[in-house]
Every structure is written in structure tokens, then in C-alpha cells.
From Swiss-Prot:
Family indicated by similarity: Belongs to the tetraspanin (TM4SF) family.
Topology feature Extracellular, residues: 35-55, 107-201
Membrane topology field: Multi-pass membrane protein
Residue ranges, Cytoplasmic side: 1-13, 77-85, 223-238
Name assigned to this protein: Tetraspanin-4
Cross-referenced PANTHER family: TETRASPANIN, TETRASPANIN-4
Principal cellular location given in the protein's record: membrane
Segments crossing the lipid bilayer: 14-34, 56-76, 86-106, 202-222
């Protein structure tokens, strides 16, 4: 009976981790594709220049693949050490995510102020050598969200030391349109515009976060159940 339970949990554990591993492969693939086609796209922070969408996806994908591989191997081999390692790694990730979420909601105002200050600092790197990713990111954000600057279009005046903005701030794009009168530029601040967009999509973000948490809890349950079954089977055989 104990052996039958172990086999059932084993196959469920393997199937779960196979899907987990394939998900990691997908995330890693998207990250590599972004890195190859978009360069350092979405590198907006001047303090963390390596914190690009591509790099985050590559690191996340590789880590998920590693955890999934450990879980698959632990399930197939019925290895207590690997199962416990998988459980501890997944528990660490779960606790880290929970801590980040709690800190984010607890210090929202401070994070807002720091983010705006850091983004304004990053504006001074716009269009400079070696900052293609940051330049592309600002161009895309200002064009797609129809906004200009971090808190105001005048943020760009400090960057250029003149009354001008990047051409991506223009209502109708044309070469050197950023030198024209302010009436031809987007007036909405990018930080608040993107923040409102995120708030409008908060339900989708919440559902995604909840699904992620449920998957992780399911993985922890499978791992600990199988670990206990392996221990029980070893004790029974002994």
C-alpha cells in the first residue's frame, strides 16, 4: 500500500516538475530572444543598469529550470536529498516573493519617491554612448503611453539645458519636432501614466500572483508528501 502511494505521488511529482521545467525553458527562451533582438531593452534604472527585462527573464528562466530539474530527478530517483533540496529551494523562493510583496505594500510611498528620483537621474543618460537600452526604453514608453518625462515634460529641460524634449514626446512625430513649441508635445507624466495603467491591470497581476503562489504551494506539498513516502518506504523495507 505504501509503495502504491509512493508510485502515485512519484508520477504526479514528475509531471508537475516537468511542466515547471518547460515553463522555465519558455521564460529563458523569451529572455534570450529579447536579448538578441532588443539589446538591453527596458533598462530604465541608472542605479541598476543590468536590470533589464531580458536579463531578468534569463535569470528567472534558468533558476526555474534548475529547480524543475532537481524536482524531476528527485522524483525519478526517489532520492530524499534531492526532494528535500527541491522543497527548500521552492520554499526559499516562496518566502522571498512573500517578503518582497509585503515590503512593497508597506513602503509604497518611499519606493515611489526613490523610483522617480532614480528615473530622473537616468534621463541624463538618454542618447549617450553605451546606453542604447535606456534610450530605446524611454522612446517606446513615451510613444506608447503618450507621455513625456518622469513627472513632467520639463524634466527634459534639465537634461538638454534647453527648452526641448526627445522627438518621442511629440504629438505627431517628425525629425527634430522636440525643438518645437510645448503645445506640440505630450503633457502627461510617464511615471503617473504607467502607474495608472498598472493599477488598472492590478486584477490581472493579482490573479497571476495568486496562481504562481498556488503552483508553488502545490509543488511544496508534492515534494514533502513524496519525501515522507520515501522515508516510510525505507523504514518499511528495513
Amino acid at each position: 500500500m505504501a509503495r502504491a502511494c509512493l508510485q502515485a505521488v512519484k508520477y504526479l511529482m514528475f509531471a508537475f516538475n516537468l511542466l515547471f521545467w518547460l515553463g522555465g525553458c519558455g521564460v529563458l527562451g523569451v529572455g534570450i530572444w529579447l536579448a538578441a533582438t532588443q539589446g538591453s531593452f527596458a533598462t530604465l534604472s541608472s542605479s541598476f543598469p543590468s536590470l533589464s527585462a531580458a536579463n531578468l527573464l534569463i535569470i528567472t528562466g534558468a533558476f526555474v529550470m534548475a529547480i524543475g530539474f532537481v524536482g524531476c530527478l528527485g522524483a525519478i530517483k526517489e532520492n530524499k536529498c534531492l526532494l528535500l533540496t527541491f522543497f527548500l529551494l521552492l520554499l526559499l523562493v516562496f518566502l522571498l516573493e512573500a517578503t518582497i510583496a509585503i515590503l512593497f505594500f508597506a513602503y509604497t510611498d518611499k519606493i515611489d519617491r526613490y523610483a522617480q528620483r532614480d528615473l530622473k537621474k537616468g534621463l541624463h543618460l538618454y542618447g549617450t554612448q553605451g546606453n542604447v537600452g535606456l534610450t530605446n526604453a524611454w522612446t517606446i514608453i513615451q510613444t506608447d503611453f503618450r507621455c513625456c518625462g518622469v513627472s513632467n515634460y520639463t524634466d527634459w529641460f534639465e537634461v538638454y539645458n534647453a527648452t526641448r524634449v526627445p522627438d518621442s514626446c511629440c504629438l505627431e512625430f517628425s525629425e527634430s519636432c522636440g525643438l518645437h513649441a510645448p503645445g506640440t508635445w505630450w503633457k502627461a507624466p510617464c511615471y503617473e501614466t504607467v502607474k495608472v495603467w498598472l493599477q488598472e491591470n492590478l486584477l490581472a497581476v493579482g490573479i497571476f500572483g495568486l496562481c504562481t503562489a498556488l503552483v508553488q504551494i502545490l509543488g511544496l506539498t508534492f515534494a514533502m508528501t513524496m519525501y515522507c513516502q520515501v522515508v516510510k518506504a525505507d523504514t518499511y523495507c528495513a
